[in-house]
Amino acid sequence: MAGLKNVLLVEDDPMIREMYRIILVDRQYKIEMAGNSEELFKKLETFHPDCILLDVMLPGMSGLEILKLLRTDPKYGCQKTKIVILSNLAQRSVTDSAIELGADGYVIKSDILPKDLPEIISSLED
C-alpha cells in the first residue's frame, strides 16, 4: 500500500471507532483516533494525517464546523489533506455542504461495510 497511510479517525462512538481501527490496522494503516473536536485538534499537534475520516455528528463542534476550520485555517496544516465525511446523515443539504466546504468524499455509513474503508481511502489517492 502506498499513498494515504496515516489516517486520523474522528468518531464519537467508541465501538464504531474500534471496529474501524481494527480493519485499518489490519491493512497496514497507521491510525490515530479522536472522539470529538478537542481530541482531534490535540492529535493534529503531533500527528500529520494523509487522510481524515470525519463523522458529522460529534459532541461540541460538528464535523462540518471542523471541516471548515481544517480547510481554512493554515495552523492545522490540513488544506490538502484528504477528508472523507462518514455519517448516518443522508440529507442532500448536508452532503452538499460537506462538498462545498472541501470534503473529498461523503460516505453514508449504512451504505458501506466497515471492510470497505481501505478501498474508500485508496480511491482518494492522486
Predicted regions and their residues:
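Conserved acidic carboxylate
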Residues: 11
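The feature encodes the CheY-like receiver
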Residues: 59
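Two-component/phosphorelay signaling modules centered on CheY-like receiver
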Residues: 14-32
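Active-site residues of response regulator receiver
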Residues: 55, 87
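Acidic, metal-coordinating helix/loop segments flanking the phosphotransfer/catalytic sites
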Residues: 33-51
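As written
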Residues: 63, 99-105
